[in-house]
Amino acid sequence: FDFMHFTQTRIATIDIYAVFFLLLMYDAMVLFLRKDLTVAPLKKLLPPLLACGVFTGLGIASKWTAAYGALGLAVLFFGKLAFTLLAEKREGRELRPLWKKCGLLCLWCCLFFLVIPFGIYFAAFLPLTTLPHNVERLWDTFVNYQTTMFNYHSQLKAEHYFASPWYEWPFDIRPIWYFASDACNAAGEYSTIAALGNPLLWIVSFLALIAAVRQLWHGIRRPAAVAAVGFLSVYLPWTLVPRL
């Protein structure tokens, strides 16, 4: 049970949808990673990638931060191709059929991870872009929404007393305090809302991450790769954000 997830769902933030689809994105990618590229036909390899692309589109349509996780998917996908090719080369096997299959997979992924996610993302704005005063300039309105959102977040100058640097987050050193009521009720009680992770889960998870990175250092392990890449892809980009 994670306290932060409980709080975020109760105050109805969109982060919960992004996290949900991020989990589905990586679940679908794991299904692909379990396939043997050397023997599995293309029709068996494509369904998990299609599902992964759909979930990616839904995640990014929910919140841009899901795009960070999509970078991790790319690392896992191309890593799978590269290590399979290297393994076959070490065995001295003919690589031409495998290269052809990898090329076809990459072409299909242009549809699954570019066209389809963009279509889903674009469709998410249709309730706004198809309003009577927007419908005649639908594309311009769509682009304007993107630039407005980007400019707002990139130029926002805001501080929060309970903000904390990114390197403190895994240890739950300074939980964020969202709200406190001005006056107490008849029983002398105040209302307050705070978001913090379950210290047991977060600290143990951080130790598990270290173990996963250590396994990767000593040799590729698929579960370790998924855990490490998945976490770092959504965590490290925040090191570049000055406003936390």
Place the predicted regions along the sequence by residue.
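Short acidic/glycine- and proline-prone juxtamembrane loop motifs at membrane-interface regions
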Residues: M4-Y17, S62-T65
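Transmembrane-embedded, aromatic-rich helix segments that form part
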Residues: V19, T65-A87
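Membrane-interface transmembrane helices that cradle and orient dolichyl/undecaprenyl
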Residues: M25-P48, F78-E88
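Membrane-interface alpha helices of multi-pass inner-membrane proteins
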Residues: P41-K63, Y235
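Membrane-interface helix-loop-helix junctions at transmembrane boundaries of multi-pass membrane enzymes
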Residues: L42-K43, L85-W108, A208-V229
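Transmembrane-helix signature of polytopic, lipid-linked glycan biosynthesis machinery
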Residues: I60, Q215, L232-L244
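Aromatic-rich transmembrane-lumenal/periplasmic boundary elements in polytopic membrane proteins
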Residues: L98-K101, W108, P117-D172
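Hydrophobic, aromatic-rich transmembrane alpha-helices
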Residues: D182-A186, S191-R221
